Regions:
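Positively charged n-region of N-terminal signal peptides that target proteins for export
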Residues: 1-5
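Solvent-exposed, non-transmembrane regions of membrane-associated and secreted proteins
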Residues: 8-237
Length: 237
């Protein structure tokens, strides 16, 4: 084989390798999305089974009590946005597997990911996480549910494009009982030790999304704040 043919083969191999590397993130994210879809279907079957209605009502009441307690204690255990690894609630006691309390959907950036209780490393590999010591994502007056996620983790695009979300955009949370819709009213960049944005606002029903910023540098935090609205008919499932 002459030198020219060898160079052509090597060039073709480099092109093939480059193409594979370019396609790999998209393919990996597609696989992640399909897995999320499959797990969501199982979740829906579980929460819509009439046999589970009573126990899920008990869970809902328990979380309402926890949210009231967090409010009354003025979130006195808040320290750092990413330090709340262990959930105070074991969802398996209520028949919910994988520690998934629901799903968050953000149409503007075309994502839908599970929400897991507890901001530990294992959970953050799987999707978004609820920060313990903030309100659980069931809505209600005097609540601020803080939901965190990586920008990207492995094969999953999570809050990668969070900075594309703007005022007026909708965020939907489908927990084990109902769908909640929130409208974005503020985005902001904060320091990692700034916990003031995670605090409950008197009389409000809000959620706060948080992730590292800037992307791949991670010296600050990017947050999105949204208030509860009821004038929508679009369903998550």
């Amino acid at each position: 084989m002459n030198k020219r043919k060898i160079l052509i083969i090597v060039a073709i191999l480099f092109i093939l390798i480059g193409t594979i590397l370019l396609c790999f993130p998209s393919a990996s994210n597609y696989i992640y999305e399909k897995n999320v879809e499959t797990e969501k279907e199982k979740f829906v079957v579980k929460i819509t089974d009439e046999q589970n209605e009573n126990i899920l009502d008990k869970l809902y009441k328990k979380l309402q009590e926890e949210n009231q307690k967090i409010y009354e204690e003025k979130q006195n255990k808040l320290v750092d946005p990413f330090s709340y690894e262990q959930s105070a609630i074991d969802l398996s006691e209520y028949g919910i597997e994988n520690n998934v309390i629901g799903y968050i959907s953000i149409p503007k950036i075309n994502i839908e990911v599970p929400i897991l209780l507890g901001a530990n490393t294992a959970n953050m590999k799987k999707g978004a996480v609820h920060l313990t010591e903030t309100s659980y994502p069931i809505g209600g007056v005097n609540t601020n549910s803080v939901i965190a996620a990586h920008r990207v983790y492995g094969k999953a695009t999570l809050f990668r494009y969070i900075d594309k979300i703007g005022v007026g955009d909708k965020i939907r949370i489908r927990n084990f009982k109902e769908e909640l819709t929130y409208e974005v009213y503020e985005t902001k960049i904060i320091n990692p030790d700034d916990i003031s944005e995670l605090e409950i606002e008197e009389g409000q029903d809000i959620i706060t999304l948080i992730t590292c910023h800037p992307y791949r540098i991670n010296t600050q935090r990017y947050i999105v704040k949204a208030k509860r609205v009821w004038n929508t008919t679009l369903c998550l499932f």
